[in-house]
A protein has these predicted regions:
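Glycine-rich FAD pyrophosphate-binding loop
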Residues: 44-63
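Flavin-dependent oxidoreductases
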Residues: 191-260
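Conserved small/polar residues in nucleotide/adenosyl-binding loops
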Residues: 293-300
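Dinucleotide-binding Rossmann-like beta1-alpha1 core, especially the glycine-rich loop
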Residues: 71-147
Length: 303
């Protein structure tokens, strides 16, 4: 399924693996995570290769809202409670450092990288926002609490993370992957601890990174028995309101909003596949209420 990101973008093409090779690190999976692993390994002078069963960055990466932020919901109070002070601080710092790394890379790529603030808002749960602010403060991060947003509806409040970013993910991926050692249309059929077999070749590696959307091999935990498919949606609304920032709802259906060119992107409506109740119609109603003209839609899947 096409998306706003896949239009008018020509991704680099890579050969199929048709021989037996050896390398220090094998990466399996060519989404954003796998491509970035390959990039940083190359920067560090490590011998590597990446195997992708189809084309790179055509899954979630090509159908995302494409926000770069350390805000992923009300997570830091929970992290503090479950991890303790030291680990929660490291978790927050790692997220913030990743945002800066993305921005630094984006400065050298034609990927519509834009620094902007990110807001986590709630229409009814002020107390939860206040608790999250307190947790962030105890972790050494000064986030702002505000009741003044650019949203076209009233909110109880919002937590602002300054200097986050948004971008065009496929432009970013196209630019960063051009000189990487990647093999496309090279699905891994069999695998051991240090070896991967494809239809036409094989890779022997000292280390293997599995960067697929879900673990495609049976590892400890038997995750293949526990996985189920979730679906969520992103609507691209032409000539929608300019929000001057990125927004994520802390409750209800996890509404996500950001602008790109003349579009307002509205994401959310997540639900378990196969369930009678889903939030697609609700998401469309919200989109019609906050945008001015026609809608375009695509669907994302997660497990």
């Amino acid at each position: 399924m096409s998306s706003l990101w896949t239009e008018n973008i020509e991704m680099p093409e890579f050969p199929t693996l048709e021989k037996d090779i050896r390398t220090q690190v094998l990466i399996i999976g060519g989404g954003m995570a796998g491509v970035l692993c390959a990039y940083f390994l190359q920067q560090a002078g490590v011998d590597y290769c990446l195997l992708e069963k189809d084309r790179i960055c055509q899954g979630v990466t090509g159908h995302t809202t494409a926000k770069i932020t350390a805000q992923h919901g009300l997570i830091y109070e929970k992290s503090l409670q479950s991890m303790g002070q030291e680990r929660a601080e490291l978790f927050l710092k790692a997220n913030l450092r990743a945002v800066e790394n993305y921005k630094n890379l984006g400065r050298f790529l034609d990927c519509d990288m834009e620094e902007t603030d990110s807001y986590l808002y709630s229409v009814r749960e002020r107390r939860k926002l206040e608790s999250e602010i307190q947790a962030l403060g105890s972790l050494g991060f000064q986030a702002d609490y505000t009741e003044d947003t650019e949203l076209p509806f009233e909110v109880e409040g919002a937590i602002r993370f300054p200097r986050q970013a948004q971008f065009q993910p496929l432009k970013f991926a196209a630019g960063i992957s051009k000189n990487l050692r990647i093999y496309e249309h090279s699905e891994v059929r069999e695998m051991t601890e240090y070896f991967a077999l494809t239809e036409k070749g094989s890779v022997a590696a000292e280390k293997i990174i599995i960067a697929t959307h879900f673990p495609f091999i049976n590892t400890r935990g038997s995750y293949y028995l526990k996985l189920y498919q979730n679906r969520s949606y992103v609507l691209a609304c032409a000539y929608g309101k300019n929000l001057k920032g990125m927004y994520l709802e802390a409750d209800n259906i996890g509404l996500s909003l950001r602008n790109y060119e003349d579009y307002l992107l509205i994401g959310g409506g997540g639900h378990r596949s196969g369930k009678e109740k889903n939030n697609w119609d609700l998401l469309r109603d919200i989109a019609k209420a906050v945008s001015y003209t026609h809608l375009r839609a695509h669907e994302t899947r997660s497990n």
